[in-house]
Curated annotation (Swiss-Prot):
The gene is lexA. This is LexA repressor. Pfam families: LexA_DNA_bind, Peptidase_S24. The keyword Nucleotide-binding does not apply. Transmembrane segments: none annotated. It comes from Proteus mirabilis (strain HI4320). It catalyses: Hydrolysis of Ala-|-Gly bond in repressor LexA. One of its GO terms (molecular function) is serine-type endopeptidase activity. The record marks A85, G86 as: Cleavage.
Length: 203
C-alpha cells in the first residue's frame, strides 16, 4: 500500500468511521460537508486517489458506492518492557511490541502486558518471564495484586495499606515486604493484575 497524505487519511478515516457507526458509507456531499471541502467533486477526487492507492474501491452508479479494501489489523495489547526512570509506564519508548490478545479475556479487561522480572510472586504462579495482563486503574484494595511504581522502580506485589504506609507483599518467602511511607516516598499504582500468559507456550 502506498502511503496516504494527511488529507487522504482524513477521508479514509471518515469513510471507515461512518461505515462503523451507520453501517453504510457516506455520500460525497457528506464527506465534503464534514471535512470542509467546497464541493462533493473535491471529495470525489480524494476518493479516486484512495482507489488508486488500493485502499478503497469505488462502485459506480451509487452515491454511497465506496468499499474499504484495507482491513486494519488491531494492534493488540502493548507489551511493556524495561521502564526508564521518570517516564510514564505506557510511554511509546517502553512498548516492546503488541500481542494479539483479546483484552476481554480478562476481568476487568486488560489494557497492557508487563514482562515479569524475577520470582518474587512465584507462589501464585507468576514466574520470571511471564506476561502479566494489567488493567490500568488506581482504584485498588487490600489483598489485590498490583503493578506499582516506587520512586522510579516498577514492581508487582500484593497490596496492603496501613495508615500512611503501603505494604507490598511478595508471594515467595525469600522476599521481605516492601514498606512505603507515603509521607516520604513517591508511590503510584499503575494497575491491577488480571491474568498471566505463560511466556513461550503461546507465542
Amino acid at each position: 500500500m502506498k502511503a496516504l497524505t494527511a488529507r487522504q487519511q482524513q477521508v479514509y478515516d471518515l469513510v471507515r468511521d461512518h461505515i462503523s457507526q451507520t453501517g453504510m458509507p457516506p455520500t460525497r456531499a457528506e464527506i465534503a460537508s464534514q471535512l470542509g471541502f467546497r464541493s462533493p467533486n473535491a471529495a470525489e477526487e480524494h476518493l479516486k486517489a484512495l482507489a488508486r492507492k488500493g485502499v478503497i474501491e469505488i462502485v459506480s452508479g451509487a452515491s454511497r458506492g465506496i468499499r474499504l479494501l484495507l482491513e486494519e489489523e488491531p494492534e493488540g495489547l502493548p507489551l511493556i518492557g524495561r521502564v526508564a526512570a521518570g517516564e510514564p509506564l505506557l510511554a511509546q519508548e517502553h512498548i516492546e511490541s503488541h500481542y494479539q490478545v483479546d483484552p476481554m479475556l480478562f476481568k476487568p479487561s486488560a489494557d497492557f502486558l508487563l514482562r515479569v522480572n524475577g520470582m518474587s510472586m512465584k507462589d501464585i504462579g507468576i514466574m520470571d518471564g511471564d506476561l502479566l495482563a494489567v488493567h490500568k486503574t488506581q482504584d485498588v484494595h487490600n489483598g489485590q495484586v498490583i503493578v506499582a511504581r516506587i520512586e522510579d522502580e516498577v514492581t508487582v506485589k500484593r497490596f496492603k495499606k496501613v495508615g500512611s504506609k503501603i505494604e507490598l507483599h511478595a508471594e515467595n518467602p525469600e522476599f521481605s515486604p516492601i514498606i512505603v511511607d507515603l509521607r516520604e516516598q513517591s508511590f503510584t499504582v499503575e494497575g491491577l493484575a488480571v491474568g498471566v500468559i505463560r511466556n513461550g507456550e503461546w507465542l
